[in-house]
């Protein structure tokens, strides 16, 4: 069993003394840094490697901080110009994950790189912190590697902005499996609908 397997097992138990201390110290450190900054190496190497990262030229890791909470509707003077049922401004829930937002912001910052994947590293009461794995499509080490050079095709430009990464597909309700396409209006809503008994009031 390799060393990263032990790291993975330690990381699984987030309530353990070791990880709680490590997360608390790292969270303080991340708060002092810029909202988007490049990391010299992944802080979770086991997770990064599972998502496709390789410690070689052409692979880059960026850390990003995203503010937690719902999305407030941008309505000047509270005017939404619609029916009263759609007048909401404050308690609206964004339909994409914060991780997707993180990927999109990093993708805009590093427009010449391609977003491969991302993962959670930390959170506090105000922010969530993610690491985003990016690939340089111009680098020879990437273009010559048959396992990753698919990302060099122009069709994969800004895949994070079009919901083509793992987290983007999740919020779009796209997955594999028999009749998965029947998950109308979200997987949680589908589960609730299929596990709730409803009766006529007068029966």
UniProtKB/Swiss-Prot annotation:
Family matches, as Gene3D superfamilies: Ribosomal protein l15e
A GO BP annotation: cytoplasmic translation
GO molecular function ontology, one term from the record: RNA binding
Keywords: Ribonucleoprotein, Ribosomal protein
Compositional bias annotation for Polar residues: 193-203
Region Disordered, residue ranges: 166-203
Pfam families given in the database record: Ribosomal_L15e (PF00827)
Top-level lineage group: Eukaryota
GO cellular component: cytosolic large ribosomal subunit
Composition bias, Basic residues: 169-192
Record-stated family: Belongs to the eukaryotic ribosomal protein eL15 family.
PANTHER family: LARGE RIBOSOMAL SUBUNIT PROTEIN EL15, RIBOSOMAL PROTEIN L15
Record protein name field: Large ribosomal subunit protein eL15
